[in-house]
C-alpha cells in the first residue's frame, strides 16, 4: 500500500479530505493567497469543489495533500501533484481516477495561509513531495508553472531543483514552466 502520509522536520503532509473544508475556505477566499491562483473563490464554489479536489489517482500518488504544522497541529496549507491544464483555467479533476495515471504532465503546486509565509514552509513541503514523486511514485518528470511575476513561487521551485524549461500556454494563459526529471533529482541527491 502506498504510504501517503509524509513527514518533514516541521510538517506532516496527508491526503486532503472533505473534512479540510475549513482550511480550503480560509485560503481560497483570501485574495492575497489567490493572487496568482486565479483569484479568490466564494465559499459556495469552494464547497462544491471539495469532492473533486479530494480525488486521487495512480493508487493515490496523484492528488492534493493537506500540510499540517507538527508542533501545533494547525492546518497551514496544501501541496499537490496534479495534471497541469493547458487550455483550461483550472485543474481537470476528471483526470483523477484511482486506477490510472493521468496522461497529462504532472505539476507540483501549493497554497499556504499568509500567517506562515516567509518561513521556508513551502520549500520544506515541496521538497518532501518531490522526494515522494521520484522515490515512491512512477513519475519520471515533475513540472511546475506560475505567473512570471510570482517570484516567491519561482524561488521555491529553484530551491528544490526545478529549472526553467519554457514559457508556454498553461491554465489558459502564458506561464513560465519549470521542470525536473527523476535522473536530475537523483543526481542532486548525490551531489548534496
Where are each of the predicted segments found?
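Short, charged/polar low-complexity linear motifs in solvent-exposed/disordered segments
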Residues: 41-43, 52-54, 93-96, 177
Amino acid at each position: 500500500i502506498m504510504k501517503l502520509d509524509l513527514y518533514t522536520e516541521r510538517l506532516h503532509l496527508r491526503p486532503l479530505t472533505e473534512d479540510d473544508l475549513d482550511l480550503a475556505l480560509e485560503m481560497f477566499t483570501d485574495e492575497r493567497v489567490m493572487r496568482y491562483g486565479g483569484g479568490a473563490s466564494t465559499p459556495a464554489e469552494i464547497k462544491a469543489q471539495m469532492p473533486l479536489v479530494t480525488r486521487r489517482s495512480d493508487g493515490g500518488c496523484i492528488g492534493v495533500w493537506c500540510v499540517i504544522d507538527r508542533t501545533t497541529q494547525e492546518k497551514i496549507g496544501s501541496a499537490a501533484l496534479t495534471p497541469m491544464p493547458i487550455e483550461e483555467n483550472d485543474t481537470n479533476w476528471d483526470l483523477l481516477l484511482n486506477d490510472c495515471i493521468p496522461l497529462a504532465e504532472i505539476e507540483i503546486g501549493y497554497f499556504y495561509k499568509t500567517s506562515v509565509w516567509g518561513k521556508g514552509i513551502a520549500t520544506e513541503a515541496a521538497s518532501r513531495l518531490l522526494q515522494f514523486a521520484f522515490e515512491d511514485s512512477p513519475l519520471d518528470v515533475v513540472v511546475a508553472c506560475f505567473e512570471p511575476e510570482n517570484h516567491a513561487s519561482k524561488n521555491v521551485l529553484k530551491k528544490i531543483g526545478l529549472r526553467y524549461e519554457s514559457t508556454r500556454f498553461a491554465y489558459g494563459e502564458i506561464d513560465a514552466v519549470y521542470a525536473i526529471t527523476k535522473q536530475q533529482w537523483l543526481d542532486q541527491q548525490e551531489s548534496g
